[in-house]
C-alpha cells in the first residue's frame, strides 16, 4: 500500500510494488501504473489505489435441493483485477481525498459481486438436483458451472475483474 506524505500545498505519493495507482483530475486519467511515485497539489485531483495481487475469497452458500433438503456448499474463488483503471472507475478504491475513519470498499464490493454470482449459479444447479445426486460426484459439474457463470458475467468483464480459480 502506498503512503501519502503531506507538505505545505503539496502531497508526495510513494506507491507500493503491489498496487496500481490511478490519478484522476477533471475526469481524466493523469497517471496510471504500478509503483508510481510523484508529487501532487492538494485538492486538485483524486487518487485510487487498486491491488494487483490475486485475492482468495471463500464463502458458504446454502440452497435447497429438489427434494427440499438443505445443502451447504463451501466455495473458494480466486480473482485478480486485470484492468485497474476500469476497476477504479466502477468500485471504491479511493485513496485521496478520504476521511481518516473511512476505508476504501472496492475489494468488499468485488467480494459481494462474486458471492452473488456464485450463489445464483449454485441455487439453480443444486436446486435441480436431488440430495443424493448433489452429494455424490457433482463437484466437477458444479465447479464447471461456476467457471462458466463467472466467464459469462458482463459486470465482471466490464469492471476489469478476472477469475483465476474456482
Regions found by a protein language model. Give the residues of each.
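Amphipathic, interface-forming alpha-helical segments with heptad-repeat character
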Residues: 14-15, 21, 53-166
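Domain-core and long-helix interface of multi-subunit machines
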Residues: 1-57, 112
Amino acid at each position: 500500500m502506498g503512503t501519502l506524505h503531506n507538505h505545505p500545498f503539496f502531497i508526495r505519493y510513494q506507491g507500493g510494488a503491489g498496487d496500481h495507482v490511478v490519478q484522476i483530475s477533471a475526469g481524466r486519467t493523469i497517471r496510471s501504473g504500478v509503483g508510481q511515485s510523484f508529487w501532487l497539489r492538494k485538492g486538485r485531483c483524486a487518487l485510487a489505489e487498486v491491488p494487483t495481487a490475486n485475492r482468495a475469497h471463500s464463502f458458504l452458500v446454502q440452497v435447497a435441493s429438489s427434494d427440499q433438503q438443505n445443502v451447504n456448499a463451501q466455495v473458494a474463488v480466486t480473482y485478480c483485477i486485470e484492468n485497474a483503471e476500469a476497476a477504479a472507475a466502477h468500485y471504491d478504491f479511493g485513496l485521496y481525498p478520504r476521511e481518516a475513519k473511512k476505508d476504501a470498499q472496492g475489494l468488499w464490493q468485488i467480494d459481494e459481486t462474486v458471492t452473488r454470482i456464485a450463489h445464483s449459479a449454485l441455487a439453480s444447479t443444486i436446486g435441480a438436483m436431488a440430495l443424493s445426486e448433489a452429494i455424490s460426484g457433482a463437484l466437477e459439474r458444479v465447479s464447471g458451472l461456476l467457471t462458466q457463470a463467472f466467464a459469462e458475467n458482463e459486470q465482471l468483464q466490464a469492471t476489469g475483474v478476472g477469475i483465476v480459480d474456482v
